[in-house]
Each structure stands twice: as structure tokens, then as C-alpha cells.
């Protein structure tokens, strides 16, 4: 253990690479299988069976889909802006997959005398005896969410198709509106936790009640705004196929289309993980099972809720959507902040 | 400091490599039989009419501009929310003034109908 | 190691900002500008200012650039064709050289380096950058903070006046 690179022990680097790989594979598998789960769950809710042919009860469906998309023809429209058209899926995908870096997904484990916090962007500082993570963890996630907009706006613009342009514009206006409301909704959480570090937010909930109980309004607002921000039903206006064909990804095919698809589901996983961490006590749960189990269970429950909502509600109309974001959610979040401020300081 | 940020760099690298690999391999593996019609923008199977590079509603700009302004408000709220218990009633008052002034702007925007989509 | 990392990020930042002014396609210029903001954010992180880094991405790359991209799309700016007029090249380089000269002059005089601040990395790591910024903003700089809200109010009214035909 004596060997050090840049002031950090070798064990740190091994643990880091392992954590990164485990989380990346976890997100990738969850993304792949939530597409399957979504088809299956909605199928059963609508008294259908969903995919049944590939593998036992269609279990190999995501793999078959992936392979199929790999072999599809790649079409780049002749009028498209090539560079922007190629880079747009990448800009959508990368922020969606790296959001997980700041989310704590389990308690600190000890391997061979070296303490490893189960959070990618964190390490155990032996000098202070504390887990050090990003001081601005929540802002990191918000910043990434604000970058995801470019993938969609560029895809819409560069395709040089009317449907794409309208879909891209609509969806970017929707995303920024709800990003704002989501960003304001979680401020009342920081007012209770007195920190933007996700480790501290989770620890604070373990000592008291979950923030979902202390801040029920913020919880509901944040979850709805997040669903709207990642363009899921009932707010999937950019993909309103009855009016916009397929929105911003009308002209996309093969793996580039799949990348938007993966980005959408990865965003859903990230949003559910953030909601778990901020409002549902993170990885804390009854002690008989390890922390990561509770974390995964809560995240999967929220993912299930997203699918349930999709099966239940019809799509919003665009003017209703914008009215909801700007005229209902925005003032509600501000009122929630002021009320929390007055109650706490009295 | 390094210990907390280095993993993010590694994760970014992995995500970028994953994305690039998907792009490159799918374009290598997939068949390519381009034709003029196939590469034309999709318009329900008809000949595309006019250009897609047209001006669009000014609504989107006002949303983008208002987003910047209220986002800055949110940015001011983050450090305040972390500190507000330590600032006490004084902190609530000063942020109250800030929010009320911006709320006046919000009401102005509402009354002028800038948030209407018809 | 830290210097080496700084060199790489700074080189990318400079390259990206050169691309901003040389790209023929305005959207590519905007993308380069976003990359420049990212490099700046990375530099803020290496300077122990994570809050600044997050705000840099959140406000500049995530909000202001969205508006700029929208405007590029609205104005339907075509790819710039042909050469720029020789006048603008001449004046541009003259102004650039003058600014460079000014910078060198200032650095040589080093009249800018005043006292060192009291906040160092150790304090930031202990208290937290967000907390330190908040403490300064909401106690020492209270008036500028409240004035900011009036500035934002003016900007909100300006945005409405600019975009509405009938007020």
C-alpha cells in the first residue's frame, strides 16, 4: 500500500477504475433492460403480452434490438449539416451517462484496510477521517442537464427537415423551462441540508426523516419537472408522432438514433437516482441488506413509476405544457422556498 | 481535490469512447445504398416543399431569455440556501426582498402575455 | 503534474477560442465557444473554485449559449462565404496587437498584483467554496446583491419589450 501516485495510494486508483466500470455497466444494462421492462409493463397494463419471441418471455429483446440497430443503414440526409448532425447524438449521450458520477450508491466499504466510499467522485481522506466528495455535487448534475439540450437542438437544426426543426425547438424550450423549475424546486432541500454535497444530503436524511416527508411539495414538483425535462410521457411533445413524426430524431437512423434513445433512458435512470438521493434517503434503508441494494431498489421503483405514468396519462398539449411549467410550477417553487425559509427560521 | 475529480474525467473518457465506438462501428458495419430520394428530408413521402431553414416563432426567444434571467436568480439562491440557517431571519429578509423584486418582473411578464401560447 | 494538466486545458481553450472566430459556420463557432467555457470551468476546478466552475457551465454554457444558438437559427445565418474585407483584417489585427501590448505592459509593471487574499485552498476544502461565496455575498456585499435583482428586473422587462409587438 506504500506506493503512491500524485499523493493518492494505489488502492484509490484500483477502486476508482472498478467503481467507474461497475457503474457504467450498471447504467448501460439498466438502460437496455428498462426498454424491455417498459414494453413488458405497459403491455401487461394494456392487457397485452409485450415482446415474447426473442428468448424466454422476450428477455433477449434489448440485445436483438441493439444488434439490429448496429446493422442498419446509416443515412445522412444530403442537405444536413454533416458535422453538427454527427456530433449531436454524442452531445446527447455523454452528459446522460456521466451524471451518475456524483451519486452515492452505498455505504463506505472496507477492503484490506482501505476504505472505499461507494460513490464515483469521492474518496476517503485518512487525514480528516471523512469521505470527501464534490462540494457542488447537485450543481454538477444540473450543469450536465443543461448541456443535454444542445444534443437535441443541434439534431433538430442540422437535419434540415421541418419536423426535426420544430421538434428540436419545442423540446429545447420545454427542457429549459422545466430545468428552471426543477432547479428551483430542489433549493428547499439545500435549505434543510445546508450543503450541496450529496454525501451530506444523504447523511442528513439518515439522521432525520426523508426529505420527501419534510418537503412533499418540492418532491412532487421536482419529480414531475424531471420527467418533463427528460421528455417522457405525458410530456413527450418532441416525439408527438401524430404531429411531428418523430421530432428531432426524424432523420436519424441506425446507431445514431439508438444513441438518442439510450440518452433518454440513461437520463431517466439518472433522474430517478437523483430523486432517490435527494428525497428518498439515498442508499439508507433497514440494516439487514446492504446499502446498494436499497439504492437500486428505490431507483427501480421510481423507474417503474415513470412507466406507470406513461401507461396512465395521455400526452399534454404544448400550450398546456408551457403554461404548467411557467405559470404553475415556477410560482409554486418560489412560494415553497419562501414558506420553508419562514417556517425554519421562526 | 484530485481524488474527487479524477474519476469524473475517467467516466467522461469512457462515455466519449463508448459513443464514438457506436458511431464508427455502426457506420462501418451497416450497409450503404444511398439514393437521392433516400437522402432527401422526410416529408410524409412527398417532395419537400420549401426550405426547413425558416424563421420560427419569437416565443422561443422570449422563453430562452426569461430562462437565462430566472436561472441567474436560481444561481443566487444556491449559496443562500446553503447558508440561510446561519444567516437567520436576516437572511430570509434579504432573500425575500430579492425574490419580491423578481416576482414583480414575473407578474409583468405574465400580464403582458409573454407566457401565452396560442 | 498540475502545470502539465493546466497546459493541456489551456491549449484546448485557446484552440477552441481561435476556432470561434475562424469557423465559417456560425453553429460550429457556437460549439467551439461552449468548449471554451468547459475548459474555463475545468481551470476553475483546478483553482479550487468548484462553485464558479458549476456556474460557468450552468449559466454560460447552459443558458446564454442556448439563446445564442436560437438566434443563429432564427437569423438563418448562412455559412460565411468569401473573404473578409481587408479593412476589418487590418483594424482587427491593429486592435489585437494594441491589446497584447497593453497586457505585456501591465504584467511587466506588475502594478496589478496587490495583497494576497486571506482565503486559500485549505480553508476552501474545510468550509466549502459555495459557503464562502455565500458568506461574502450575503453579508459584505449585500447592497450589490440586492441591486442585482433590480438589474434582472430591468432585463426581464427588456426581454418582453424586445419580443412583443404590442405592449
UniProtKB/Swiss-Prot annotation, chain B:
InterPro entries: NAD(P)H_OxRDtase_bac/plastid, NADH_UbQ/plastoQ_OxRdtase_su3, NDAH_ubi_oxred_su3_sf
EC number: 7.1.1.-
Function: NDH-1 shuttles electrons from NADH, via FMN and iron-sulfur (Fe-S) centers, to quinones in the respiratory chain. The immediate electron acceptor for the enzyme in this species is believed to be ubiquinone. Couples the redox reaction to proton translocation (for every two electrons transferred, four hydrogen ions are translocated across the cytoplasmic membrane), and thus conserves the redox energy in a proton gradient.
Reactions accelerated catalytically: a quinone + NADH + 5 H(+)(in) = a quinol + NAD(+) + 4 H(+)(out)
Protein name: NADH-quinone oxidoreductase subunit A 2
Any one GO CC term of the record: NADH dehydrogenase complex
Keyword field: Cell inner membrane, Cell membrane, Membrane, NAD, Quinone, Translocase, Transmembrane, Transmembrane helix, Transport, Ubiquinone
Keyword Transmembrane helix: yes
Enzyme class: translocase
Family annotation (Gene3D superfamilies): NADH:ubiquinone/plastoquinone oxidoreductase, chain 3 (1.20.58.1610)
Subunit structure: NDH-1 is composed of 14 different subunits. Subunits NuoA, H, J, K, L, M, N constitute the membrane sector of the complex.
Transmembrane annotation, as ranges: 5-25, 60-80, 87-107
Localization: Cell inner membrane
Membrane topology: Multi-pass membrane protein
Coarse class of the protein's main subcellular location: membrane
One annotated GO molecular function: quinone binding
Protein family: Belongs to the complex I subunit 3 family.
